């Protein structure tokens, strides 16, 4: 939902450029979309104010930083009260190894995406999890090969 302001094609072009390289100077972005600097800068500011641009960040390579294991943890709970969900969410969000937390449909209730340096590092995470949070069932899958990973939103398909 885009709230108070309609996103136009120039905004989509700006967003596409920023997704690929958020370090580009405004003057370079403006040139690519056919605007002068000030209107381009204003559009970027508005997109940030609307929350369309959440933040500008660097994408790091986990393996080059020693995180050689990516693990998806599937959690099933038999506790569906707000108190349990709040405790679970607070605990998981405070774990530095967690790079994603999702409430999902299907057989499991939650999916956690974790980076671990090795099996021992993951086991420590797992042991702490089951010690601190009452969980009905847990299943973990280690990523064998990353075949595609992308942070870009496919905005060229948005209407």
Positions of PLM-derived features:
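A compositional/biophysical signature of low hydrophobicity enriched in polar/charged and small residues
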Residues: 1-159
């Amino acid at each position: 939902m885009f709230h108070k302001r309609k996103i136009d094609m120039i905004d989509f072009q700006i967003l596409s450029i920023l997704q690929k390289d958020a370090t580009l100077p405004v003057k370079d972005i403006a040139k690519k979309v056919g605007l002068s600097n000030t209107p381009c800068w204003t559009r970027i500011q508005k997109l940030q104010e609307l929350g369309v641009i959440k933040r500008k960040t660097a994408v790091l390579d986990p393996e080059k930083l020693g995180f050689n294991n990516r693990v998806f943890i599937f959690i099933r709970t038999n506790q569906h009260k707000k108190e349990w969900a709040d405790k679970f969410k607070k605990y998981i969000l405070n774990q530095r190894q967690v790079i994603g937390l999702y409430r999902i449909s299907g057989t499991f209730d939650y999916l956690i995406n974790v980076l671990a340096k090795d099996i021992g590092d993951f086991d420590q995470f797992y042991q702490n999890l089951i010690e601190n949070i009452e969980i009905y069932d847990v299943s973990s899958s280690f990523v064998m090969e990353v075949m595609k990973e992308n942070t870009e939103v496919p905005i060229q398909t948005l209407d």
